[in-house]
């Protein structure tokens, strides 16, 4: 299915990436042109979130020149992992470029910043990181990655199975770390797991020795690190260096090869929940998302090298799959570039059911704007420097 969804031939201009193939912009009916869809994208291509934003940008660069049968133009901006810049980018995309939807951003703080603009301008947002918008923002905001709740259940169930009773927490001192802490604390009690001590660090910190020593002093059975990208390697490597022997868990925010490269041998044995794309070939042949995940992984690696697949490129492609289906529906009701079209797009996305994507099956409804349930996750362990399903 996805074999014809990729193309090269994207023109780069400064920080803006856009394309529109001329043959597709010319209508088959003389004197008429089909209305083009414009999609804004703000990603963390630089800064601490670059290991997430770069592959997302690469995936956008592989997309077909149509969306829902209409020509499409993508405008891609870099927010440098800065929520303030993400806000400016989103505002520009919505008010100046008048995009039909916004994809992004790459990190939770930046996604939340974009959500505020999306709600204010009534522009659909497809976030590429797990986050929970406010009730007032929910109408126009969707989140592609697996929710913290879905992933937290997977790691907590594994902890219970391995008789973990005490759990230390080291997480980002931002909305991503806070989301994981709240969810872990809310769910751990039912599994008779005590969460303490709780430590934080910033994405650009160079040392977490003090936090690691507190874990060692408490002699906890396991530690979970709530971080994303390569900064997630720091607490883990510090714990290993200090001789910590307990189980170490990470979140799906670190699931890329840059993390493995930075973490080195300290990543061996770490446990984390990931999406299907990372281990597509290891999935059961009957898994409903295996075909799409395997196909995209092969095409991505053909372009960017063996082993380069990652969750984040998959999220960007999943955004395309969702929009491709939704645009085809919305275009029957309104013209791109209008508020009526954007509203129709939201309604169409809310009707997404059983869409096979790189992480599993996407199901969305008006009450739940997250994409994946339990079938969109799998627990893996790093063995021999590779992601392995136990």
What residue ranges belong to the model's regions?
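Bacterial N-terminal signal peptides
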Residues: 11-26
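Extracytosolic ligand-binding ectodomains
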Residues: 2-9, 21, 31-390
């Amino acid at each position: 299915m996805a074999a014809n969804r990729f193309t090269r031939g994207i023109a780069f201009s400064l920080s803006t990436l856009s394309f529109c193939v001329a043959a597709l912009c010319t209508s088959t009916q003389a004197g008429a042109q089909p209305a083009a869809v414009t999609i804004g994208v703000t990603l963390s291509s630089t800064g601490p979130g670059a290991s997430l934003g770069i592959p997302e940008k690469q995936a956008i660069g592989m997309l077909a020149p149509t969306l829902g049968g209409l020509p499409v133009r993508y405008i891609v901006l870099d927010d440098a992992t800065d929520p303030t810049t993400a806000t400016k980018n989103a505002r520009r995309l919505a008010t100046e470029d008048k995009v039909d939807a916004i994809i992004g951003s790459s990190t939770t703080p930046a996604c939340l910043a974009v959500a505020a603009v999306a709600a204010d301008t009534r522009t659909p947002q497809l976030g590429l990181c797990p986050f929970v918008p406010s009730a007032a923002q929910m109408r126009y905001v969707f989140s592609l990655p697996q929710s913290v709740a879905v992933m937290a259940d997977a790691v907590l169930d594994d902890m219970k199975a391995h008789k973990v009773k005490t759990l230390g927490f080291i997480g980002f001192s931002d909305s991503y770390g806070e989301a994981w802490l709240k969810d872990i604390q809310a769910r751990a009690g039912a599994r008779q797991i005590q969460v303490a001590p709780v430590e934080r660090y910033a994405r650009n910190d160079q040392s977490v020795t003090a936090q690691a020593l507190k874990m060692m002093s408490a002699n906890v059975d396991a530690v979970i690190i709530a971080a994303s990208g390569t900064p997630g390697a720091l607490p883990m490597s510090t714990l290993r260096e200090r001789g910590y022997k307990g189980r170490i868990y990470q979140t799906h925010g670190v699931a890329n090869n840059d993390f493995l490269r930075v973490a080195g041998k300290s990543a061996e044995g770490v446990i984390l929940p990931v999406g299907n794309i990372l281990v597509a070939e290891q999935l059961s042949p009957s898994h409903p998302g295996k075909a799409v995940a395997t196909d995209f992984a092969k095409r991505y690696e053909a372009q960017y090298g063996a082993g380069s697949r990652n969750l984040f490129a998959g999220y960007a492609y999943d955004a395309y799959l969702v929009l491709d289906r939704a645009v085809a529906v919305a275009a029957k009701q309104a013209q791109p570039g209008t508020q009526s079209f954007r509203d129709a797009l939201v309604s169409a996305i809310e009707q997404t059911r059983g869409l096979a994507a790189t992480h599993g099956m996407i199901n969305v409804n008006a009450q739940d704007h997250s994409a994946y349930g339990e079938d969109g996750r799998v627990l893996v362990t790093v063995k021999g420097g590779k992601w392995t399903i136990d």
